[in-house]
Amino acid sequence: MALWGGRFTQAADQRFKQFNDSLRFDYRLAEQDIVGSVAWSKALVTVGVLTAEEQAQLEEALNVLLEDVRARPQQILESDAEDIHSWVEGKLIDKVGQLGKKLHTGRSRNDQVATDLKLWCKDTVSELLTANRQLQSALVETAQNNQDAVMPGYTHLQRAQPVTFAHWCLAYVEMLARDESRLQDALKRLDVSPLGCGALAGTAYEIDREQLAGWLGFASATRNSLDSVSDRDHVLELLSAAAIGMVHLSRFAEDLIFFNTGEAGFVELSDRVTSGSSLMPQKKNPDALELIRGKCGRVQGALTGMMMTLKGLPLAYNKDMQEDKEGLFDALDTWLDCLHMAALVLDGIQVKRPRCQEAAQQGYANATELADYLVAKGVPFREAHHIVGEAVVEAIRQGKPLEELPLTELQKFSPVIGEDVYPILSLQSCLDKRAAKGGVSPQQVAQAIAFARARLG
């Protein structure tokens, strides 16, 4: 069933119809389209287009259709309707006859689809927020269980300073908290209803759009009809949030892929999230993490694609906007799947503490401590930095860690070095001294875990 046709004397070419139709992807808006139609039927009563009895009949039929869709959503794709709006209206007419043809009075598919998509976005943001917080909780739990797992921290993929696995987990909690905040901010801006804006100039019926927005669960109604039907900022914002969120998950995956290598050996992944090789029987591949990392690109592509689609569009609605859905659906589905998978990876991870500690003791990760020790003895930091660099070169030459160089050797680089230097060079001392807010000291990590637990509830 087409919602237009009187203007045309020829039928659409089937090739054009296939090119133009959107039901194959906008079927996902079925529930939102039906909910929006129920609200619109109520609004039509207030302006005398429908009687209360007619509205009740329409609402009952729409609610039955809603249950049918929830029970068997695949039925929608069996239709040759142009889009989800055509499908819903056609099914409604099948149920109530001519009365169904009155529902679209004063409404355009332009404000209808804008409303449907915003309702879908609100529902999906709620799912994303739940999944995000579940992953944050999984990271906090992993941090709680690994506060004593000392490991090397890296810059430039070179061992830099000792940290703990707990501190590493909490770094990703911070990233995910920002992702959560971005979603909440986006939700505030998309929580305005475009329904009642018509094709572009507004509806000719004196409908209370604020009341209509409230029936649909929106905070308010939009203020300008031209903007309302052409606005896709919420699509861009959610795609941007997804793109940033997927970058965080990709970095998380890359870290764990490295930690899981034979060369690092800091963690072992569960059999539940790894796979084997068809040729090499010894292999245990981190496929879940590699797929998270790999899927990041498609989400970035969806954001870029939508930016390019919108950049040259004049006001108001253009068919180009039909391209807003496939990329958005795929990007948010992908992000949601990856959030769930990241939590599953953490659920079975094993941290190999002895190997982590062994690696932390290598690479002269305590060199900064020696520099700070010299500063405490009155040596200017830049001079101390140079002195320690020379000491590291000598330690490398001898094949020893700094703490195994004899005092006489260390004093060749600076006479202020005394026996009290050796406790300073221990891993525990390296951690304990990082006691400022946000640092890796046990006290700060414990406080960060407690703060995250309280915030997540």
Swiss-Prot record:
Pathway(s) it belongs to: Amino-acid biosynthesis; L-arginine biosynthesis; L-arginine from L-ornithine and carbamoyl phosphate: step 3/3
Catalytic activity, as annotated: 2-(N(omega)-L-arginino)succinate = fumarate + L-arginine
Keyword Acetylation attributed: no
Alphabetized SUPFAM superfamilies for the sequence: L-aspartase-like (SSF48557)
A molecular function (GO) term: argininosuccinate lyase activity
Similarity remark: Belongs to the lyase 1 family. Argininosuccinate lyase subfamily.
Name the record gives this protein: Argininosuccinate lyase
Native species: Escherichia coli O157:H7 (strain EC4115 / EHEC)
